[in-house]
Amino acid sequence: MTKATPPTLAAGALLWRNVEGDAIEIALVHRPRYDDWTLPKGKLEAGEHLIECAAREVREETGAIARFGPLLGQVSYDVEGEPKNVTYWAARAVEMHEPTAESDEIGRVQWLSPGAARAVLTYGHDIEVLNSFLKIGTGTLPIVLLRHAKAVKRSDWDGDDDDDRPLDSRGEIQAQRLRSTLRAYGPLEIHSSDANRCQQTASLLSDKFAAPIITESSLSEYSYKRDSEAALSRIKQLLQLERPLVICSHRPVLPHLARALLENTHLDTPTASLEPAAAWVIHARGGVVIAIDYLSAPE
């Protein structure tokens, strides 16, 4: 039996910008090779996270440095008989530079109203991405519920206090890679459990975002066991700050934090546990959660 060809993985964004009032414009790119109008996207490079790929391709093809918002989904289609999967996010242009893509790859960038973009887009799957974006809307802020990077196993730790258990060598690499992954969401305020493995993870992010670490003792694993209501009350307070945040905590605690944030929404509560350095990204507008995404751990 012939093995199925694995799909080519790619990522991109529905890139938008504010214009007058509440109006927005969408970026479309023209590809001379195909003579089509599409959304900025490109193939995944070795060792690259999908959201990193999307941010890089947006920068190369449009010149925009973007702040990423909700995941809009994945589209699949064939290119010259080979399968391709493209993952898209919403992304707001916050700074513009000259595109760096070759002119035979991207010939032109055009900013259009959503209605005009729908009429110009060549492919139906791009229109579906646009529709998903319009359904969610703009003005969201992320809260990244992050599990700390990989730590030394409890069975291998001979310290007296489990809160002192550090990252292992793999976890240190993961924490460094998280800086590139989470950069797509823009500058983030960092809140962390007081456990050493969380503080180490947060410290590497703090260096990248030039942000202080705000220690949240109520969000540690053992504090949650003693007083779960304090942790749940605190995460709801953090939601009302209406600022982009990273909350670094623990596998047993994070599902409860997510459930508290998703109360009174139509969204499904995550059921699977997060692996080290993975996250759920909550997107909120006006202190109300409107979307939740899964963000896999960096390689």
Predicted regions and their residues:
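Active-site-proximal alpha-helix that buttresses catalytic centers in soluble enzyme cores
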Residues: G42, G47, C53, G139-R226, ...
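Active-site-adjacent alpha-helix immediately C-terminal to a catalytic or transition-state-stabilizing loop
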Residues: L232-I290
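Unchanged
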Residues: L44-F68, Q74-V129
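N-terminal strand-loop-strand
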Residues: T2-L39, I143-H148
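Short, well-ordered beta-strand micro-motif
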Residues: L15, H30, Y88-R92, W111, ...
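Short beta-strand micro-motifs in enzyme catalytic cores
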Residues: L9, E25, P83-W89, A278-W280
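Short, solvent-exposed aromatic-acidic interface loops
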Residues: V29-Y34, D293-E299
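Non-catalytic terminal regions with compositionally biased, polar/charged low complexity
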Residues: D126-E128, S132, T140, R259, ...
